[in-house]
């Protein structure tokens, strides 16, 4: 499967970057969906929801409501069949319920089939189309990596349809985010990050098959809190722009969680403004698949034994990052 091409390697004449967003429906991922819909040069082809840091039914309902809110009900939404090894704590997974119940979305009736569309089938179809059109996809993945591996296990040739992978996951030089108060201390090691811990085996397989993944670990997202200044700016903009008002109401749901960060928005905004990020550091990585340190991503003990990935450790312009988010949300849509 080999090295993933950079943006400059995408087919000549491409005006928009085809993006598939694979996520697990936390607050930050709903905002990322909005950002992708207004980000210049992005063609959002599909949303695939993983039943990981969410609850599937309200997550799909919220996705449907959000797409109606932004006038993009044409974007397909599907539910992945992925199953994790270590389940997210229930207290984390309820944010999608709160988002689904926001008053600003109440006027929109969810349009979700029963059973919902199959996420792996949607990803397979989009990869096949990408190969036929010679227009590889950018996969923005802000949850576990399981759906990609589940698709490739059935047809490895579909990897040709992957142009780039952006992944919010891991913790390299900082502590992980397994909290012993919500995760049994018998497994709550200090190194693992939840998107890796949920299914460390899929991370291992993706690292083995692909090089050049653009990774946004906790190292960078830790520096992007949902600050009071950011909330105040959204509130002010919300007086004129409904996208900002929705983001304000959504992030207000988590202001009581001091650990909350713009984890997924950090990865998402790189697509539009890579200049806001310090250059990535290329380094080989491995992940612990078993034992107490399960989910820990680190440099391999044997050099030269693993593919090299592109790790973003910090912003070049953190203030510019926040301003970019605010600028994108200063809209009422088309």
What label would you give each PLM region?
Residues 2-65, 109-215, 221:
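Active-site histidine-anchored catalytic micro-motif
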Residues 91-98, 179-183, 231:
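Short, surface-exposed amphipathic charged segments that create phosphate/polyanion-binding patches used
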Residues 45-46, 74-79, 285:
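Short N-terminal amphipathic alpha-helices
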Residues 54-58, 86, 171-175, 286-303:
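Short, mixed-charge aromatic SLiMs
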Residues 2-6, 10-17, 60-131, 302-316, ...:
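Metal-dependent C-N hydrolase catalytic cores
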Residues 88-90, 176-178, 226-228:
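Short, well-ordered secondary-structure micro-motifs
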Residues 2-17, 31-44, 194-197, 201, ...:
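Conformational coupling and interaction surfaces
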């Amino acid at each position: 499967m080999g090295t993933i091409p950079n943006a400059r390697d995408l087919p000549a004449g491409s005006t928009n970057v085809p993006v598939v967003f694979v996520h697990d429906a936390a607050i930050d991922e709903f905002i990322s969906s909005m950002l992708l819909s207004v980000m210049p040069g992005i063609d959002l082809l599909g949303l695939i929801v993983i039943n990981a840091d969410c609850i599937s039914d309200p997550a799909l309902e919220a996705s449907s409501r959000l797409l109606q809110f932004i006038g993009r009900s044409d974007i397909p939404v599907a539910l992945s069949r992925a199953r994790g090894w270590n389940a997210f704590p229930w207290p984390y997974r309820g944010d999608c319920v709160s988002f689904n119940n926001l008053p600003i979305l109440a006027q929109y009736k969810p349009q979700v089939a029963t059973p919902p569309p199959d996420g792996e089938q949607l990803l397979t179809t989009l990869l096949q189309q990408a190969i036929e059109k010679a227009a590889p996809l950018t996969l923005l993945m802000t949850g576990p990596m399981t759906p990609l591996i589940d698709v490739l296990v059935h047809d490895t040739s579909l990897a040709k349809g992957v142009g780039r992978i952006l992944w919010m996951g891991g913790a390299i030089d900082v502590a992980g985010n397994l909290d012993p108060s919500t995760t049994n201390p018998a497994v709550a090691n200090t190194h693992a990050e939840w998107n890796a811990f949920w299914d460390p085996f899929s991370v291992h397989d993706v690292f083995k098959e692909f090089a050049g993944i653009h990774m946004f670990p906790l190292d960078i997202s830790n520096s992007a809190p949902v600050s009071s200044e950011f909330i105040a700016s959204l509130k002010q903009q919300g007086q004129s722009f409904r996208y900002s008002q929705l983001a304000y109401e959504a992030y207000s749901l988590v202001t009581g969680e001091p650990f909350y960060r713009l984890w997924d928005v950090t990865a998402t905004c790189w697509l539009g403004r890579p200049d806001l990020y310090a250059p990535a550091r290329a380094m080989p990585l491995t992940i612990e698949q078993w034992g107490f340190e399960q989910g820990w991503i680190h440099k391999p003990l044997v050099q030269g034994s693993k593919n090299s990935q592109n790790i973003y450790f910090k912003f070049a312009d953190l203030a510019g990052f926040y301003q970019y988010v605010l600028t994108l949300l200063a809209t009422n849509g088309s």
